[in-house]
A protein has these predicted regions:
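A short, well-structured beta->alpha microelement
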Residues: 2-21, 77, 121-124, 211-248
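Active-site regions of enzymes building and remodeling cell-envelope glycoconjugates
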Residues: 26-34, 45-54, 68-79, 89-92, ...
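Binuclear metal-ion centers of metallo-dependent hydrolases, dominated by the metallo-beta-lactamase
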Residues: 82, 131, 143-222, 226-230, ...
Length: 333
């Protein structure tokens, strides 16, 4: 078999390449994007692999999220979208994945002309669908229960909700790196005039996103005197914090969580002044099925290592397309 997902979460493509986890047998490692579940074992890969491949934006994000010295522990090569690298008798090309800044799909073509594709994490709308013979794909929302059937424009709803919250004072927005910068850009583009306040790490990630073309507006560090006064006085401003900080900051304030795990409603109030907005950076079930339909693979492997519905998605793919499909690694029980 020309692709596999190992028990440690490495996505093997062809003879030489492992994506998103360490694999001692493969000389090449790819990091598809800078989220923790796709950077597993990276220190080991840097020590032992001939090359670790990623986009320039992903490298810049890892420099901020880990440290600029971290990637110096090995040989890192950045690869632009659409550029091909040859290793032995295989060719590796990155294509854009609409997920977070720098996210990539990976195509490996072997000497027999077989096209082996790993989607990485993606949203279908702005992700190019690659023709594949063997397709390895994410399965985060791989169940038919994970469909976003609402028609409303979630971005517009999010902007309206934040503007409503600003009438009461400070609005705290919680999300993950990449998603936070996406919502900053949405608010900036919509002309929301309130100051943006961020802690140091979110600030540094945001500056990388701006360097790569995102437009986020002026950001104020939360430790600055002016920002402290805004937050302490519950003045109208928007404070952006990583989801991990939700129990530490903004208690009692107007709070908005951006999350993909919402399918019934685009916006839900679950406590007084606390809302969840369904802004996802993953395809829902219909988006995953659509990728398979357009890619026309002979074999699909779903990622059964990371969080999701890999086995359910396999059943649906077999039923709808009559093609071979496997959830890997196999888990029993």
């Amino acid at each position: 078999m020309k692709a596999n997902v190992t028990a440690k979460g490495a996505v093997q493509l062809g003879k030489y390449l492992a994506c998103d986890a360490f694999d001692e047998k493969m000389p090449l490692r790819v990091v598809t994007h800078a989220h923790a579940d796709h950077m597993m074992g990276l220190r080991q890969s840097l020590r032992t692999c001939e090359k670790v491949l990623m986009t320039k934006a992903t490298k810049d994000l890892i420099d901020v999220l880990r440290s600029p010295l971290f990637l110096m522990g090995g040989f890192v090569e950045t690869l632009d979208y659409g550029k091909t690298l040859q290793h032995e008798e295989e060719w590796i090309t990155f294509f854009r994945a609409d997920h977070i800044l720098g996210a990539a799909q990976v195509l490996v073509e072997d000497v027999e002309g077989t096209r082996i594709v790993f989607t990485g994490d993606f949203r279908i709308d702005e992700t190019p669908v690659l023709d594949a013979d063997v397709l390895v794909m994410e399965a985060t929302y791989g169940s038919p229960l994970c469909k976003r059937s609402f028609r409303e424009n979630v971005r517009d709803l999010f902007v309206s909700l934040v503007e409503e919250g600003l009438k009461q004072g400070t609005v705290y927005v919680f999300g993950y790196h990449g998603k936070l910068q996406e919502v900053m850009q949405i608010l900036h583009k919509a002309g929301v005039k309130a100051p943006f306040v961020v802690p140091e790490r979110v600030f540094h990630v945001s500056k990388i996103c701006e360097r790569h073309g995102m437009r986020l507006g002026r950001l104020m560090l939360s430790v600055e005197k002016e920002a402290k006064e805004l937050l302490e006085g519950n003045a109208p401003c928007i404070a952006f914090y990583h989801m991990g900080s939700k129990r530490r900051v903004g208690q009692g304030s107007f709070r908005v969580y951006v999350s993909g795990w919402e399918f019934d409603s685009p916006c839900r109030e679950f406590a007084d002044k606390e809302y969840v907005v369904a802004l996802s950076d993953h395809s829902d079930f219909d988006g995953l099925i659509e990728y398979v339909r357009r890619s026309k693979p002979k074999l699909v492997i779903t990622d059964n290592f990371r969080v999701g519905h890999a086995r359910t998605l396999v059943k649906e793919i077999r039923k709808r397309f009559g093609i071979s499909a496997l959830a890997l690694p196999k888990k029993y029980g």
